[in-house]
């Protein structure tokens, strides 16, 4: 009798009464070997995910079952429930039920029940009542229970059914207390493909003065909580919301969006949110518009670049032909980053179709352009553009397309011929000495390479350039990438804005008609006769006609003035086969792209370009960046460049970043 009472008492060396129960007994006595807590052969108990309230207060090991064994042994099985853990500071406003592990499996299992509904559950008149399933009793105290009936009234529907595309989105189609009733009016002119999905859409008619999102409807933001590895539903919601805010942010709203937002409260009930590849809502009625998340502000930014002709850099707007008409103060901001550039506050677009007339640009050859701003058409064109871009950005095409090595010998011959035409003999000698110092290294590294090695070298170049193009598009700094011969291989749009050189001209896709060589302080004198002393003395101004009109990549020496070219090649001779991770920081003067027509335009300017910049105290937008150095044809910059080598330790490409002096 004494042994039994002694066994019921917890031992000082045991951590819980469960552990004492697991110790084997022989003849009423406890084995000393099994009672040793440090014995490796002693059976270990699996830790519970969450202890009950009684075990938590007693600091004892609990189990996953409810009621647990200790509470059953003590007669507390009726009061055995999960203990409450201390919340983190950022979770103080979260309900207790949302923090229970595995809550996503119980909160959002209604979708499975809805997908099993038979067609008979829908009434013939186009209406159906969907009752939200009851949740588990564990959330009864934290989640308010409600029974909402969502009425879908489709006037053009005859026999609606659950679309097959609904399986693509596991989100629930249940109603929420914030929006109990929805009335969707479908147009007969809409395609039949989108009609079934529109009839099943819910949650779009929320009041604009309510919460920004409904926490009980995660499908509103197109992410599945069950697929996220989070221990609680609240953390998954927070993570998904942050991701939505990061990817769906928009720029300054258009000026007329205030009226749209006020009048769009009744238009939010006809939006399709499921099965949409772009995340934007489509339009179901010709008299109503659909907006991304019920707000026209977030819907306008995605197509701002396509609908705004001022965002074009390579066109005639930022070419020198229409340079005098860039004084508009509503020009877009400079250095806009990304493929879908946000619209500036002044470059607004109306929700209706607008026409850009060429009257604002008197001498510009821009034609009248109709801007289509219908939401579903704009979103479809954006989706097609993204698909085509992803198809084009396939690195495997590089290895299939490169069949021949690049002729660097011909490139160096063209470079030497250009240097002899443009520079005076003393400057030509300095550049030739710099190139001659690295010529033996080039010969030594390439003499053992065969045809396959040269083809592989070109594939490495194209593959590296493929990666650098992504960095150039993501970086707002004027950037160019050149081969070791100095031929331009890639260029960012910011560089085109700054210098006026179109991307097509730099890459050799269009003829080079530049006449600006930076020879004098007044570039208008450079349009004189091309026979004026091309091979003259060092002190004479050298102003040739356009060097070539054929389509060939532009050399880096054509983009810099004389002194900057000499300094670059002297630095390149030291860095080409020197420090593999070294870089050079220096100042230079970039030459603006100017044709003969631009030179005539500068003559009649009378200094208004530079005086306008000084008077304003800076630059405004892309037009202001384009005005830098317009009169003298040179832009003072600070630039940093480095040399990237290939697998044969040969200089492969030159990456250069420029920042103008304002």
Curated annotation (Swiss-Prot):
Source domain of life: Eukaryota
Biased composition (Low complexity): 343-359
Pfam annotation, one family: PAS_13
DNA-binding feature ranges: 52-80
Zinc in keyword set: yes
SUPFAM superfamilies for this protein: Zn2/Cys6 DNA-binding domain
CDD domains the record matches: GAL4
Alphabetized InterPro entries for the sequence: ERT1_acuK_gluconeogen_tf, PAS_13, Zn2-C6_fun-type_DNA-bd_sf, Zn2Cys6_DnaBD
GO molecular function: DNA-binding transcription factor activity, RNA polymerase II-specific; RNA polymerase II transcription regulatory region sequence-specific DNA binding; zinc ion binding
GO biological process, one term: gluconeogenesis
Compositionally biased residues, Polar residues: 27-38, 112-162, 266-287, 522-532
Annotated keywords: Activator, DNA-binding, Gluconeogenesis, Metal-binding, Nucleus, Transcription, Transcription regulation, Zinc
GO cellular component, one term: nucleus
Family: Belongs to the ERT1/acuK family.
Role noted for this protein: Transcription factor which regulates nonfermentable carbon utilization. Activator of gluconeogenetic genes.
Stored PANTHER family: TRANSCRIPTION ACTIVATOR OF GLUCONEOGENESIS ERT1, ZN(II)2CYS6 TRANSCRIPTION FACTOR (EUROFUNG)-RELATED
UniProt name for this protein: Transcription activator of gluconeogenesis TSTA_069700
